[in-house]
Amino acid sequence: MRVIGLMSGTSYDAIEAAAADLTLDGDSLLLRPLGHLSVPYPDDLRALIAATLPPAATTTQAVCALDSGIGQAFATAAARALRELCAGAADLVVSHGQTMHHWVEDGVVRGTLQLGQPAWIAEETGLPVVSDLRSRDVAAGGQGAPLVGLTDTLLLRALPGTPAALNLGGIANVTVVAPGAEPLAFDTGPANALLDAAVRHFTGDGAAYDADGRRAAAGTVSPELLRFLLADPYYRRPAPKTTGKELFHLPYLLRALDAVPTPATDDVLATLTRLTAVTVADACRAHGVTELVASGGGTRNPVLMRMIDEELPGVPVRRSDDLGLPSDAKEALAFAVLGFLTVHGLPGTHPSATGAVRATLLGSITPGLAPLRLPAPVARPPHLLRIV
């Protein structure tokens, strides 16, 4: 089955589209990547997303406009992927949409909202669309995140020791696969979320991120600011757990800066970069990780990757590209896998990874132009993911 996966993370800068041929072969899921592309959000849509995200107030009119606008942007990305990556022929589109709110109270996820109306994608491509992949896990008592955990688990099972997959997006998350134990997946804390917010704030929106970590490299870590940030109760909560920009946003950072002697801008960026490295390393040490496989936009920040290396001496860190899974496309491919599992009647989560009471089939299906015909249900889920 040829599947297109679409993803936009908490950095909300672009839609990542990836295509793959997926085939079940015994206890293995075979994945042949067909390529990936990145489609930036239009400036006005990105500005509306930024103006609507927590802690901002909004209106139902803005939510409706976003649902249509994001759906249309995802439809454009899907059409490009269909044309440029699939030579015009595919079977399924899987759309994560854009997370606008992840509702957490006292550590319990009450709901999650991803916008991007899938009807626009189905109409543009003519293909069936699997979307809204997080809500079913939440309804089953889970965190609804991180959903890359199942794909990570299938990939890591072939590695020795206790490997972990690390995704460095707006939020950092890890999946740990220890021998003889159920897989564990959780958000460790902010990756690019606070960094990007700080850069935009201090440059008056003149820059969106710290390119190559150059400004962090020019700064010095503030012990007072780092200590204050590490005191956040989130880091002491047990896994599985999830977080997002509902917690780690610009006002959160500004409150922290008000509480300590104010560092220079580059020192703030150095401290935030070190915060990500420390919280990732703490999570890995707590679970005996022996190897780290990293992906996501944060892997392009050499200063962040160096700091993670420094915090985890003796633990090799490599990119998912080394395993055949392109780092920039990994999340989009992971959602392609989840949609493939859904249409084959297979669950897309491990309860140990999300905290749900059961493994659930994920998402809702929007038919394409042709009558909806699903594959025959498969009795046994795959045990391994092989990149071919």
Question: Which residue ranges define each predicted feature?
Answer:
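Phosphate-binding/catalytic loop of phosphoryl-transfer enzymes
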Residues: 2-3, 104-112, 119, 123, ...
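Catalytic phosphate/nucleotide-handling subdomain of diverse soluble enzymes
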Residues: 8, 13-24, 178, 197, ...
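Short beta-strand-loop/turn "lid" adjacent to the catalytic site in phosphate-handling enzymes
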Residues: 56-116
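Generic structural signal for well-ordered alpha-helical scaffold segments
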Residues: 75-83, 152-157, 258, 274-285, ...
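Conserved acidic residues
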Residues: 90-91, 163, 290
